[in-house]
């Protein structure tokens, strides 16, 4: 359903050249809103429908259920980070001459945003909890990557840093809100 109906519709709004979002001047270079936002909302609804894991919410309180293998989680994030270079850089859709320079800049901005997302999430958890949280830092990397995907073809390195940093900070509070207020696991 999502792949056959929802993504083509949301993609058409921006990427068909005459979609209503494109006509409003909306820029989504590599799919931050068109791909990641649609997938994120679908995942949130899916998690709400499936319900929490056993033991997650006991007596109305949110209990931490630790990950099973943080090393494999970190490896997965680093593989995803590497793949994002092809995703964002490949959205340039051409290689050679000036296009190669533009694609290189896209890859650099993407890398800067991912690193800034990690720094943002780690800094917030360090300030809040008195120690860094590797799991949340890895979420910050992904948040930085998602945050830069829309504007990676148009942003400077400083803009990429700021987008990633803000994404990394927001993800910490978003996860807490979804977990503790909305009670979606």
Residue ranges, per PLM feature:
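Hydrophobic alpha-helical transmembrane bundles of multi-pass membrane proteins
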Residues: 1-185
